[in-house]
């Protein structure tokens, strides 16, 4: 459907868009979406932040003396430990096997990639907080930092201790932990890694950066204190009711120990649930660990984390989350709770009604943006507008403003690689696309570096991300121009200017690329500067953080979409964003009131006055971000 906004061969911005038959189109989206804090349950600070996701093992090695050992990774997938192992060189070619890996004789690449450890740690994060501050980041979401043998740490051995190899004294920490009674919080010590985590939180807070941890409360790992006790003591274990045990060792019955793992993965034993959610034993443990990190040593919430991201929240009963939210908000009413729920918006809605979570990792925003900006056959601006309106209007007031508007994460291919492979499948079909976007499962997946045109499309997404309703979230390294297929390739070591990176010569099949296809691995300084610019625009203009929203331009024929961010007082500062998603340059005309000034914050474009209108020309696949002041 086309909305008639064309006057004298140009697009005209109107306060309310009208189609050719004079009837309003997408009335929900045409109404102003307002942020009204007095009726909201969300923490107001969460509207104003720019998020950065850190995958600790791959972010920065700040202390080589604490690096993992072969013994420390036993229990992680793949379960069979290799004969030869070492910490992997940070700047090495991702698909090239090192000599120690070749010596193992393992034919499957994915097993090599999962066994690698690069040595990222909390000291590395502390060392790079100034970088994050200079980028404009004001909140960090950490993938799990708790004790675990894996690189991703979603197989927790403990929730009340930071992984010893993230801290300065791994062996000393392990000795202290071994003396505890996990069921008695009064016996829990503060290890050197725990103390470093508290220091990291304080250093972040000094820079006005909020911190949230990843809570993996649906399951633990096979190395967990509780599960190991069940394996050892079977039916006599005090933890036997924590997990879903299918059978115990019983020679008389001829049964062997067996348990249920998350999605069939035996290395991730699931907690048992009843009608109230996770049963009382693990529930009490989770609650105690929650309090520990939110109000450490009972010194005050200012010393603790500012909230949680909850892994696979959809696998845990609603009643558990309702109880857990009450606990969290009783500790810190301003804590932010965000959930991983990758599903249709109407399936997400029950979790975001005020009694469970404040927001979500907004994958539906990424799906919708993909369909408009990246898909080979893009949806029309009118459909894009309607889908965005659903995401704004489906939830209670304030939720859309605190949803984490991301593109990629540790569970998806990087945005640059997604654009390179934009025709491989439907991103919204999460399960199927997950496999299609893994190089190991799709031999047609292109693992090359994005070219200049593809990077320009990434920038176009960033423009939308930084100006639209919701809190932007950047996956570590996207701002540097990192690329990679889905897990595990999306978890490459971070690019830093003081580390030398060899060229990517090898392909996933072990073959060398033709010389013309070799990719130089380096920081994309132009892309980094663009991220800094767009983040600064968002941080400097409160209207982009908390302002109301209104769609103002929809033209399906010309591929142009525009919206306005403004305060409740129309005389306040306004920002208009116009996206030209077509393959052609477009001229747009905007009405100009007397004494109004227009400034393009993004481009050094020239605007021409034509009576009561301002005209500007927007290049193909680009946008304008206009500041309008009285």
Question: Where are the model-predicted features located?
Answer:
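Bacterial N-terminal signal peptides
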Residues: 6-15
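Carbohydrate-interacting/catalytic domains
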Residues: 17-55, 59-61, 66-83, 90, ...
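N-terminal structural segment of carbohydrate-active enzymes
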Residues: 26, 30-210, 218, 284, ...
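Aromatic- and acidic-residue-enriched segments that line the glycan-binding/catalytic groove
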Residues: 47, 63-84, 148-168, 217-261, ...
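Conserved, mostly hydrophobic/aromatic
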Residues: 54, 132, 142, 159, ...
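Short, solvent-exposed turn/loop segments enriched in Gly/Ser/Thr/Pro and often Arg
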Residues: 56-58, 140-152, 213-224, 311-316, ...
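Active-site-proximal helices and loops of the catalytic beta/alpha 8
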Residues: 201, 205-209, 218-219, 227-234, ...
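Aromatic-lined glycan-binding groove of carbohydrate-active enzymes
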Residues: 388-437
């Amino acid at each position: 459907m086309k909305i008639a906004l064309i006057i004298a061969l140009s697009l005209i911005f109107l306060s309310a868009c009208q189609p050719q038959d004079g009837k309003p189109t997408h009335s929900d989206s045409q109404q102003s979406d307002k942020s009204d804090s007095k009726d909201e349950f969300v923490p107001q600070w969460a509207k104003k932040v720019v998020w950065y996701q850190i995958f600790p093992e791959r972010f920065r090695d700040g202390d080589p003396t604490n690096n993992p050992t072969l013994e420390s990774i036993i229990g992680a997938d793949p379960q069979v430990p290799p004969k030869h192992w070492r910490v992997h060189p940070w700047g090495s070619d991702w698909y090239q096997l090192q000599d120690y890996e070749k010596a193992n004789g393992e034919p499957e690449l994915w097993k090599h990639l999962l066994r690698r450890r690069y040595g990222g740690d909390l000291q590395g994060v502390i060392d790079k907080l100034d970088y994050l501050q200079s980028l404009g980041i004001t909140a960090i979401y950490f993938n799990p930092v708790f004790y675990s043998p894996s690189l991703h740490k979603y197989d927790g051995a403990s929730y009340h201790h930071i992984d010893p190899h993230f801290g300065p004294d791994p062996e000393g920490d392990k000795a202290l932990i071994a003396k505890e009674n996990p069921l008695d919080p009064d016996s829990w010590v503060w290890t050197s890694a725990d103390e470093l985590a508290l220091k990291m939180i304080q250093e972040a807070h000094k820079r006005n950066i909020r911190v949230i941890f990843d809570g993996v409360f649906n399951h633990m790992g096979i190395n967990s204190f509780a599960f190991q006790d069940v394996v050892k003591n079977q039916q006599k274990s005090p933890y036997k009711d924590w997990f879903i045990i299918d059978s115990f060792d019983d020679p008389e019955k001829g049964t062997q120990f067996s348990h249920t793992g998350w999605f069939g993965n035996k290395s991730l034993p699931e907690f048992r649930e009843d009608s109230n959610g996770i049963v009382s034993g693990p529930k009490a443990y989770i609650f105690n660990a929650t309090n520990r990190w939110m109000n450490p040593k009972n010194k005050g919430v200012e010393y603790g984390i500012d909230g949680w991201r909850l892994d696979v929240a959809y696998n845990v009963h609603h009643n558990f989350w309702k109880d857990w939210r009450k606990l969290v908000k009783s500790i810190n009413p301003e804590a932010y709770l965000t959930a991983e729920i990758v599903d249709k918006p109407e399936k997400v809605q029950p979790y975001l009604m005020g009694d469970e979570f404040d927001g979500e990792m907004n994958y539906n925003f990424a799906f919708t943006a993909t369909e408009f900006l990246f898909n080979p056959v893009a949806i029309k601006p009118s459909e894009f507008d309607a889908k965005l309106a659903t995401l704004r209007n489906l939830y209670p007031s304030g939720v859309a403003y605190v949803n984490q508007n991301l593109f990629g994460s540790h569970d998806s291919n990087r945005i640059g690689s997604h654009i390179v492979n934009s025709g491989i499948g439907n991103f919204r079909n999460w399960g199927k696309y997950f496999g299609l976007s893994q190089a190991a499962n799709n031999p047609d997946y292109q693992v090359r570096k994005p070219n200049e045109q593809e990077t320009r499309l990434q920038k176009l997404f960033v423009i939308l991300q930084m100006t639209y309703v919701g809190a932007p979230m950047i996956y570590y390294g996207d701002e540097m121009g990192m690329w990679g297929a889905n897990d595990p390739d999306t978890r490459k070591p971070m690019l830093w200017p003081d580390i030398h990176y060899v060229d990517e010569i090898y392909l996933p099949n072990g073959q060398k690329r033709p010389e013309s296809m070799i990719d130089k691995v380096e920081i994309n300084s132009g892309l980094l500067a663009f991220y800094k610019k767009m983040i600064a625009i968002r941080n400097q203009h409160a209207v982009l953080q908390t302002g109301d929203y209104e769609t103002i331009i929809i033209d399906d024929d010309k591929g142009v979409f525009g919206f306005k961010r403004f305060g409740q007082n129309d005389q306040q500062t306004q920002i208009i964003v116009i996206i030209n998603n077509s393959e052609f340059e477009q001229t747009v005309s905007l009405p100009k009131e007397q004494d109004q000034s227009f400034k393009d914050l993004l481009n050094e474009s020239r605007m021409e006055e034509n009576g009561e209108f301002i005209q500007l020309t927007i290049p193909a696949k680009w946008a304008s971000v206009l500041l309008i002041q009285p």
